[in-house]
């Protein structure tokens, strides 16, 4: 049934009239450019296409292992949790709730869904579309509430599993309140390393701009810290980055309102960083002008602050530098080859290992081998890591696993592996039907 629902819903979302409706609805509540909002609709549609036909059935593929005697065999099953909850943030009003909701349903659960109330109209409309495509109305409960009310509901209803996507603060609170019966997709302080091989400067500057500033930096995968190898100092990468950032404008929402930080709080953060010795403002650092964005939201120009590497790793600065600012903001630093171990130490100390990019086509730089201690991939743990010249931190489509690593509570989104991991548990049924051998006698007690 869910294969059929997915096929119909994928078809509906492929109709220009419908995809345009959802794109514009997303834009109304989560300010981003048309292209970025459309990206959500597109990924959602492709995800639904992936689970048409028998693909939902195949998600629950089981296996059997021969037993010790005739009639015995063990079967491993992916088993649903039953009553589950899904909590999702404001920044992806369609993609995150649809992908997680359908994953929960595909694996046979009964979910209650709570989307951030600022943006939940998008999912309300999408549920109507899904009902129209055959989703039985009793299969999903949809609640609109604030966080406090949802917290109470979870504690009273006691779902067997809750999937939380949002800030680390709420994630940790819920992990305690729900006694660990939770999977998390929480904050990202995502980094990118430009390796020693300098090439394709324009392309790499463009990807950096998109990663840091698209959706005004309000993606959990947004580039927050950029490490640039000293070989790039001969290039005009920074000035290109500045030019690209300055192209962004409020009129088309290529930069726009920040929903969870005010202008003052972001500028105060910039000023605190500028007190660190050797740091400097590369560009931005000013409020947006000529707008009517209410002051409870933030509105700043795309901003980059340079902080020297040796200052970043100092105890007193580290926490400040690695604070997630959910807005158009990034830290930039540089490093020499001999300083790679310091870079790796800075990455290791981060608490949220979500996305990362290692921009290099030098395989020895990318890979770690046990006798080379300072290479990147083998020394880091981020769940979604892009490696190679075209590496990015954002843009993970439905065909890439997206989620943190290194935390047993870490969830994933999008792929069959993510769905099976998050929305089902392993159950083994050992069939042992006999026959009991004809000559069997009661053995001595053991
Ligand atoms: N890892 C990921 O996949 C991912 C994806 C998107 C966003 N994020 C993170 O989300 C954050 C931004 O989103 P946000 O500001 O909406 O996050 P948030 O934590 O404030 O809210 C997330 C959701 O939790 C609800 N909530 C808040 N308090 C709650 C409580 N006590 N009990 C139950 N529910 C509660 C909110 O109403 C909302 O629906 C950033 O930190 C970002 O990195 C992570």
Please state what every model-predicted region is.
Residues 48, 123-126, 153, 174, ...:
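Hydrophobic packing residues within well-ordered alpha-helices of enzyme cores
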Residues 34, 74, 116, 143, ...:
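Hydrophobic alpha-helical scaffolding
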Residues 27, 58-204:
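Rossmann-like NAD(P) dinucleotide-binding subdomain of oxidoreductase/dehydrogenase enzymes
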